[in-house]
A protein has these predicted regions:
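Short hydrophobic beta-strand that contains or immediately precedes a catalytic carboxylate
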Residues: 36-38
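Sec-dependent signal peptide recognition
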Residues: 2-10
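Hydrophobic h-region of N-terminal signal peptides that target proteins for export
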Residues: 11-19
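Acidic/histidine-rich helix-loop elements
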Residues: 45-61
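Active-site-adjacent betaalpha module
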Residues: 20-34, 43, 61, 74-78, ...
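Von Willebrand factor
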Residues: 67-94
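Short active-site-proximal "capping" loops at secondary-structure junctions
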Residues: 41-43, 50-52, 82, 88-90
Length: 244
């Protein structure tokens, strides 16, 4: 029995040591790099948004709104292409026969609602619209707005196609919400052969009783992506190694 306990203790100590020293693959920003931002929309980022009660604390703690704006500015300063993956729900999406927990919640609170693909009536200033301070960056010809994702990941939109068609192999990922859409995009992009870095403090996640989405997201960014930047680290990286 004592030998068994020693073996278990040694095993746990070894495993803990391994995970405490995770490798750092690194991420070099070059001409094949793009920025992908998920859901920079009012329902997540405005205090008037329907999800603010869940994500607002994390948005404020991470300084997410300001950090996302810094990333938009960096994209212009260093001529890095930007791809926006938005989240929209049309009227026909509300007749789905089954939903997951967060899908059901989003539908119940009319999150990201629009009439249909061609109907923009009531869109301006709605929860599905861009946060106003980002519009001057997004509404430029150099920014690609993909078709909407419908659940969390980019499997249901054309993000990967748009990236590949512009010769993008590397992605700097940021946006909302951290443990859902941003993390799901990270996973799908990695599975599709993209090299992915995440700007951890340019995301935010729901914090609910007994649940900390931001902590979960930051853990998975570290374990899955090639590098996790802070916004300040990304600024310094681009100053030291401008994109060529």
């Amino acid at each position: 029995m004592k030998n068994l306990m020693r073996t278990v203790t040694l095993f746990l100590f070894t495993i803990t040591g391994v995970f405490a020293q995770l490798p750092e693959p690194g991420f070099t920003i070059d001409g094949s790099t793009a920025i992908v931002i998920t859901d920079p929309q009012n329902d997540f980022l405005s205090p008037d948004g329907v999800a603010w009660g869940a994500v607002g604390q994390s948005v404020q703690e991470n300084n997410t709104i300001e950090n996302l704006e810094t990333i938009f500015k960096l994209s212009e300063q260093y001529n890095i292409p930007v791809f926006i993956s938005p989240h929209y729900y049309y009227e026909h999406d509300h007749v789905w026969k089954f939903e997951g927990t967060l899908e059901k919640l989003m539908h119940n609170i009319s999150m990201f609602d629009r009439g249909d693909q061609l109907n923009v009536e009531g869109f301006e200033g709605s929860g599905a619209d861009w946060l106003p301070r980002y519009k001057k960056y997004i509404e430029k010809d150099r920014v690609v707005v993909t078709s909407p994702h419908k659940v969390f990941g980019s499997e249901s939109n054309d993000l990967a196609l748009q990236l590949r068609k512009q010769g993008v192999d590397k992605v700097i990922l940021a946006g909302m919400s951290g443990n859902l859409c941003a993390e799901s995009h990270m996973r799908e992009l990695v599975e599709n052969g993209f090299e992915v870095a995440v700007v951890g403090d340019a995301t935010a996640s729901a914090k609910l009783p007994g649940l900390d989405g931001d902590q979960a997201a930051q853990t998975n960014y570290k374990m899955i992506s090639s590098r996790v930047f802070t916004t300040d680290e990304l600024v310094k990286e681009l100053k030291m190694h401008p994109v060529r």
